[in-house]
From Swiss-Prot:
Belongs to the FtsK/SpoIIIE/SftA family. GO terms for biological process: cell division; chromosome segregation. InterPro entries: FtsK/SpoIIIE/SftA, FtsK_4TM, FtsK_alpha, FtsK_dom, Ftsk_gamma, P-loop_NTPase, WH-like_DNA-bd_sf, WH_DNA-bd_sf. Residues 170-930 are cytoplasmic. It is found in: Cell inner membrane. Consists of an N-terminal domain, which is sufficient for the localization to the septal ring and is required for cell division, followed by a linker domain, and a C-terminal domain, which forms the translocation motor involved in chromosome segregation. The C-terminal domain can be further subdivided into alpha, beta and gamma subdomains. The alpha and beta subdomains multimerise to produce a hexameric ring, contain the nucleotide binding motif and form the DNA pump. Its main location: membrane. This is DNA translocase FtsK. Homohexamer. Forms a ring that surrounds DNA. Essential cell division protein that coordinates cell division and chromosome segregation. The N-terminus is involved in assembly of the cell-division machinery. The C-terminus functions as a DNA motor that moves dsDNA in an ATP-dependent manner towards the dif recombination site, which is located within the replication terminus region. Translocation stops specifically at Xer-dif sites, where FtsK interacts with the Xer recombinase, allowing activation of chromosome unlinking by recombination. FtsK orienting polar sequences (KOPS) guide the direction of DNA translocation. Pfam families: FtsK_4TM, FtsK_alpha, FtsK_gamma, FtsK_SpoIIIE. GO terms for cellular component: plasma membrane. It comes from Pasteurella multocida (strain Pm70). GO terms for molecular function: ATP binding; DNA binding.
Length: 930
């Protein structure tokens, strides 16, 4: 818990402190009046003929004390002390205890019930006279009213129950625990850790708060907020100083038996422990003989006298440990010695003990060596090679003067069952029954119960005051107005004084984090919808965000888009779901270990839980080989997972050609996007009027008639490490990605590019201009943050899935805590899809168009024939200077293979140059140019 370092109070807290100070003085005044009470004084219930007042507190004090005695009887003796004690307690808290009308009413109700119960018990248990009742008027009235119905026993039980109930409501703890703490205070003992936690969890003065699992917008709008106010009502000036804490709910009795974990007390050398502080007093610890364990190679100290006699060490040896067996500490049968600081026999005989131990060690080593030699001779006599190897493999006791022993380190391979391949290297072939459900179930993901980490209002208030105090030290005047607690971070929203710029706070973020003793903080200069700035600080206990929890949320279930992807939760704990179709492309960057690959897997699994293979197809490029190769074999793939970067460029080139083909279809059907195209296909299929392919030409396929058009599926291209792809074919890949990013949105091709090196040579300006949606995980510097987000902030993230998301068309950054899933969960989902069907790979995606054209052209070149369109293409190329194969394909309405073959013929005839960086040059000129 963060310690309070600021004594800055609000005006309301100063007013309350003043009231409590007045209550203390009034309590002292009543104690003086109680100590000098005399029944002869003129008071509330009696009159005297004596004109003077005997009571030291005067007539007013005598009147109050007599009133207490008449109303409450003997119970009135404790009321002055209660008034003083309660006022002193709250005054010592110095405004740490939040007040509210409900809490004040609860305390008054509990105290009233407690007084009623105690007065009833005093009336029943003690003697009463016609002039004085032991329980006062209150106790006598209650006994008289309920005695006919409950009798003596019933009134005793009822009075006891009322007293206990009132005590619990008023104090927030049980009477037994209070007695234990009172006894510990008398005996100067500190309460145990468990008792302290239980007190904290059940005391209404220090109400504990827990994070909500899934807070919704409706719940926040309905008033699910806890105001840290100290009075039933507040004026306009007081409301300005209130701190609103969102996403917190009050809990009581959070402690349970599951939180009590067994703890092991580590062995600590006695010479390192000089004094132990108990209850604020320094007490010398009792010396005890620690157990000597041979599980340690180092010698263990016998007592605290080792500081004076460093040469005195116990005899220890190392016992061979077999893998898989529990390590048991073995102790030799030695007489127990009770040591104390007054005993000096050990120090006097240290030399003798050391000689005895060395002799014992040499004797033990000699016997062990002799035993091993005898066993080796017997093994050789019996020609038992396995026994000999076992003996040689046993660890030997290393003495100070042992010779080097040369052991064979060559592994001995043995057959593993029916195979010579190690089980770890064998490919697991699992035969899984085809699931009956249309989509995978969320039961494939592990259900991890959310852990509600407690956080107190006191900690929130103290941290808020520390932030205000440290900002004041840096010359910034600000007031915390709102606090939003999330699963990973807490955002403190501050109102700056007029004339203070938000950039001034951003410039001191590092110094402010150091002053607040946080690992890092992030300053949000703009909070949409609020006139505040935000300071986001990490929580002490971080809550894990699971993928199942996000996929099972209403936000993800009610999303209508096929390409909805779950990212995680925002700082308020609400699930974050994005639509890839609206992005329409995504750029992901983050340093190594920041959670980038887990974030990409989260997006892929979100789609696999939502779409069918005929709706969405994947092209996965994995330079790391191990990140996306687990998805190899799912029916959503258009081709196998690409691990060769040279083939990856071919896959992107195929996407460009597919984009051009789809645009021709959209133009022929007079629609603007893939949604309109699929709707028109469904409309005519419902009327049994399939639409023939309008761009089909004889020779493109083996069909004699144009085939019917089918619905187009979305294509998601995922590149796990974009930097490796840029290193192999940078310029060519940049142009291909730029073309896809510019035009592929309407025809359903979307890109997800991830890299761990967000530098300008990888994320070029051409790529950034066409990919507006970005996600930044933890990066190394502010320069990298500006490269990916055009803003700073990603360098201050906490890692492990903590990210900043910038959507298309908005410069606002949303902090998201990424969802987590294990490798086993990913494997279960992949196996489920593999059991549903096999992938239908498209041949030629990874093949270079130039290679195919060369092979096809080889046969025609041998025959000495040129294409029929060769002369027309030559005229077109020399006049326009265009050397694009896809452009020739569209211009002359030929297939891709034929267009590539013509382009190769142009190269052989010397009309165009060879391919260089994805381009060709026109070498020939028209005759009119001469």
């Amino acid at each position: 818990m963060i310690k309070r370092i600021s004594e800055k109070f609000t005006p309301k807290q100063y007013l309350l402190a003043f009231f409590f100070l007045v209550g203390m003085l009034f309590g002292v005044y009543l104690i003086v009046a109680w100590s000098s009470y005399s029944p002869l004084d003129n008071s509330w219930a009696s009159s005297s003929y004596i004109p003077t007042t005997i009571n030291k507190a005067g007539r007013f004090g005598a009147w109050f004390i007599d009133l207490f005695f008449v109303l409450f009887g003997h119970v009135g003796h404790i009321i002055p002390f209660l008034i003083f004690g309660i006022s002193f307690y709250f005054w010592r808290r110095k405004g740490k205890v939040p007040f509210s009308f409900f809490r004040l009413s609860l305390w008054l109700l509990g105290f009233s019930i407690f007084l009623c119960g105690v007065c009833v018990l005093f009336t029943l248990l003690f003697s009463n006279t016609p002039y004085y009742l032991s329980g006062g008027v209150l106790g006598g009235s209650l006994v008289t009213a309920f005695f006919p119905m409950l009798d003596f026993v019933g009134l005793m039980l009822s009075g006891t129950l009322l007293a206990l109930l009132g005590f619990v409501l008023c104090s927030g703890t049980s009477l037994i625990r209070s007695c234990i703490y009172f006894y510990d205070w008398l005996t100067m003992k500190n309460p145990t850790q468990t008792q302290e936690e239980e007190t904290i969890s059940t005391t209404p003065v220090q109400q504990e708060l827990a994070l909500q699992e899934e807070p919704s917008i409706q719940s926040i709008n309905e008033g699910e907020r806890v105001f840290v106010s100290e009075a039933p009502s507040a004026t306009m000036d007081e409301e300005k100083s209130l701190i609103n804490i969102e996403n917190l709910i009050q809990i009581q009795g959070l402690e349970s038996a599951s939180q009590a974990k067994e703890s092991t007390i580590p062995t600590v050398p006695l010479d390192d422990v000089n004094q132990v502080e108990l209850g604020g007093y320094a007490v010398e610890p009792e010396l005890a003989l620690p157990s000597v364990s041979v599980a340690f190679v180092e010698d263990t100290a016998l007592s605290s006298s080792e500081a004076e006699h460093e040469d005195s060490k116990p005899f220890t040896t190392q016992i061979p440990h077999t893998a898989g067996e529990p390590l048991v500490a073995t102790e030799f049968a030695m007489p127990k010695v009770s040591l104390s600081p007054l005993d000096t026999s050990l120090s006097d005989n240290s030399e003798i003990a050391r000689e005895d131990e060395s002799d014992l060690a040499r004797q033990f080593a000699a016997q062990e060596q002799q035993r091993r030699e005898e066993m080796a001779l017997r093994a050789k006599a019996l020609n038992a090679e396995e026994a000999l190897q076992t003996i040689l493999a046993e660890p030997e006791i290393r003495q100070n003067s042992t010779a080097d022993v040369s052991d064979s380190t060559t592994p001995h391979y043995k057959p593993y069952g029916e195979s010579l391949i190690h089980p770890a290297l064998q490919q697991k072939v699992t035969t899984q029954v085809k699931p009956t459900t249309p989509m995978p179930s969320l039961d494939l993901l592990e259900h991890r119960p959310s852990q509600a980490h407690r956080i107190t209002q006191e900690e929130i208030i103290e941290t808020s005051q520390r932030i205000e105090h440290q900002l004041r030290n840096f010359g910034v005047k600000a007031t915390v107005k709102d606090v939003l607690v999330g699963p990973v971070v807490t955002r403190y929203e501050l109102e700056l004084q007029p004339g203070v710029k938000a950039s001034k706070v951003s410039s001191i973020d590092t110094d402010l984090a150091r002053a607040l003793m946080f690992r890092s903080i992030r300053v949000a200069e703009v909070i949409p919808g609020k006139p505040y700035i935000g300071i986001e600080t990490p929580n002490v206990n971080r809550q894990m965000v699971t993928l199942r929890e996000v996929l099972d949320s209403d936000v993800f279930r009610q999303s209508n888009s096929l390409l909805s992807m779950a990212l995680g939760k925002d700082i308020s704990g609400k699930p974050v779901v994005v639509d890839l179709a609206k992005m329409p492309h995504l750029l992901v960057a983050g340093s190594t270990g920041s959670g980038k690959s887990v974030g990409v897997n989260t997006m892929i699994l979100s789609l696999l839980f939502r779409v069918k293979p005929e709706e969405v197809k994947f092209i996965m490029i994995d330079p790391k080989v191990v990140e996306l190769s687990i998805y190899d074999g799912i029916p959503h793939l258009l081709t196998e997972v690409v691990t060769d970067m040279k083939k990856a460029a071919n896959a992107l080139r195929w996407c460009v050609d597919e984009m051009e083909r789809r645009y021709q279809l959209l133009s022929a059907l007079r629609v603007r996007n893939i949604e309109g195209y699929n709707e028109k296909i469904e409309e005519y299929e419902a009327m049994n009027m399939p639409i023939p392919n309008p761009i089909w030409r004889p020779g493109d396929t083996m069909d004699t008639l144009p085939p019917a058009l089918e619905k187009l599926s979305y294509i998601v291209v995922i590149v796990d490490e974009f930097a490796d792809l840029m290193m192999v074919a940078g310029k060519q890949v940049e142009e291909l990605i730029a073309r896809l990013a510019q035009k592929a949105r309407a025809i359903g091709i979307h890109l997800i590019l991830a890299t761990q090196r967000p530098s300008v040579d990888v994320i070029t300006g051409l790529i950034k201009a066409n990919i507006p949606s970005r996600i930044a995980f933890t990066v190394a510097s502010k320069i990298d943050s500006r490269t990916i987000l055009d803003q700073v902030g990603a360098e201050a993230l906490l890692g492990r899935g903590d990210m900043l998301y910038s959507g298309a068309g908005s410069s606002d950054l949303v902090r998201v805590h990424g969802a987590f899933m294990s490798d086993d969960e990913v494997a279960r989902v992949v196996d489920d899809w593999k059991a549903r069907g096999k992938p239908n790979y498209i041949e030629g995606i990874l093949d270079s168009g130039e290679d195919e054209a060369t092979e096809s052209n080889g046969a025609n070149s041998d025959a000495g024939e040129l294409d029929d369109l060769f002369d027309e293409v030559v005229e077109f190329v020399t006049s326009t200077g265009t050397t694009s194969t896809s452009y020739i394909q569209r211009k002359f309405r030929v297939g891709f293979n034929r267009a590539a073959r013509i382009m190769d013929q142009l190269e052989e005839q010397g009309i165009v140059s060879a391919m260089q960086n994805g381009k060709r040059e026109v070498l020939a000129r028209r005759s009119s140019d001469f």
